[in-house]
């Protein structure tokens, strides 16, 4: 439906559509949002959102023109100057920049924590800075990009209950599920209010679309959709159609990527030149990480981190030697992609912070595609030799 505007049957119908769209009145039972203008909604977007909600087991979904527009609109819908956001580290470089630069500039404070941080430590830091009453959002990315470290989603209910009990206010818990969802992890089941995605990645899987999505209950999605209307960040009709088509093969693609990833992890862990392999479910990630994996993940997914030596030179040498695997950012596509997070996707994160949260100069991030795994292993083998 490549159109900018829609014809009303009557003037009364047009009036009613606008009343609902601008929040002057709520939808009645069995009433649907009317088609007005493609900045507000369009059939392709509505079909996509309905399917995304089914995949996530949520009431509603909101589709966006990019993953960052989904994340930033969600944060802006729920945060105002004086509020505090708690967020897990590491997180996607764009998210890190938005939190630590844009939100900071408008007066939203932030407290970061990593996978080793206990809830009590987070609480003590908040209390020491007198910020517990100001926390309005908990933002978690798990597995973390690019280290694959897992954040225990049980922290969501614990923190929400503690703040509700002491300060009698609700916080919004948001989980970036791009790495594992919607097949291999279900954050809503652990108390998350909203789940966000860069739909560019696994959801689309063809490296030909930029898109984002947020899923949750009707009440939690409503302020996000309202703000989306005025920011103009909704997904375009043709992009929505492409993404809807891609969802038809989602399970086939992701399951094949997972099978390939497990074969590659097995190869890398046994290769004498590979120092570390980071993949959810590996015992080498530590018992605590293994326990979290077993409690909330259905699979380790198709993202792998590994190091040869802790140097940029060693990482660049391997990346420049790859023949089949493409040297490019992004992830979750049919083709395998490899990149250097320290100098590329996470270049904006201060060097000291990168090292503290496990993003070393030698770390390579590999997004595994649907190629024959023997071909991928052969490519990695020749690049390592």
Question: What are these language model-derived features?
Answer:
Residues 5, 10-11, 216-220, 247, ...:
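Short loop segments at secondary-structure junctions
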Residues 8-69, 94-101:
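Conserved N-terminal alpha-helix of the aminotransferase class I/II PLP-enzyme fold
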Residues 33, 59, 210, 239, ...:
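Short amphipathic alpha-helical segments
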Residues 55, 268-272, 322:
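Acidic-histidine catalytic/liganding microenvironments
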Residues 59, 100, 109-111, 123-130, ...:
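PLP-dependent enzyme catalytic core of the Aspartate aminotransferase-like
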Residues 60-273, 278, 284:
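Conserved PLP-enzyme active-site core in the AAT-like
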Residues 274-364, 368, 376:
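Conserved C-terminal alpha-helix-loop-beta "cap" of PLP-dependent enzymes
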């Amino acid at each position: 439906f490549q159109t900018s505007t829609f014809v009303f049957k009557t003037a009364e119908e047009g009036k009613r559509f606008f009343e609902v769209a601008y929040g002057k009145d709520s939808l009645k039972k069995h009433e649907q949002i009317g088609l007005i203008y493609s900045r507000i909604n369009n059939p392709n977007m509505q079909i996509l959102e309905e399917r995304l909600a089914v995949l996530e087991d949520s009431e509603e979904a909101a589709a966006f023109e990019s993953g960052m527009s989904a994340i930033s609109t969600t944060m802006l819908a729920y945060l105002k100057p004086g509020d505090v956001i708690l967020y897990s580290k590491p997180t996607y470089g764009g998210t890190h920049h938005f939190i630590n630069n844009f939100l900071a500039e408008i007066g939203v404070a932030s407290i970061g924590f990593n996978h080793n941080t206990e809830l009590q430590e987070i609480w003590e830091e908040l209390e020491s800075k007198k910020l517990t009453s100001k926390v309005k959002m908990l933002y978690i990315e798990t597995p973390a990009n690019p280290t694959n470290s897992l954040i225990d989603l049980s922290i969501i209910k614990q923190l929400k209950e503690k703040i509700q009990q002491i300060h009698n206010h609700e916080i919004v818990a948001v989980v970036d599920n791009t790495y594992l969802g919607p097949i291999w992890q279900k954050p809503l089941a652990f108390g998350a209010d909203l789940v966000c995605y860069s739909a560019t990645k696994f959801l689309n899987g063809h490296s030909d679309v930029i898109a984002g999505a947020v899923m949750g209950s009707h009440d939690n999605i409503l302020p996000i959709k309202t703000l989306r209307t005025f920011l103009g960040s909704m997904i375009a009709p043709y992009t929505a159609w492409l993404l809807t088509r891609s969802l038809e093969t989602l399970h086939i693609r992701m399951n094949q990527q997972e099978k390939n990833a497990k074969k590659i992890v097995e190869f890398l862990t046994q290769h004498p030149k590979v120092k570390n392999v980071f993949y959810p479910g590996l015992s080498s990630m530590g018992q605590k990480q293994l326990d979290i994996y077993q409690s909330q993940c259905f699979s380790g997914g198709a993202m792998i981190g590994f190091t040869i030596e802790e140097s940029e030179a060693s990482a660049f040498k391997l990346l420049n030697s790859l023949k089949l695997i493409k040297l490019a950012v992004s992830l979750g596509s049919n083709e395998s992609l490899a990149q250097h997070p320290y100098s590329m996707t996470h270049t904006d994160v201060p060097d000291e912070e990168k090292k503290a949260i496990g993003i070393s100069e030698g770390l390579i991030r590999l997004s595994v595609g649907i190629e024959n795994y023997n071909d991928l292993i052969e490519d990695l083998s020749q690049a390592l030799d």
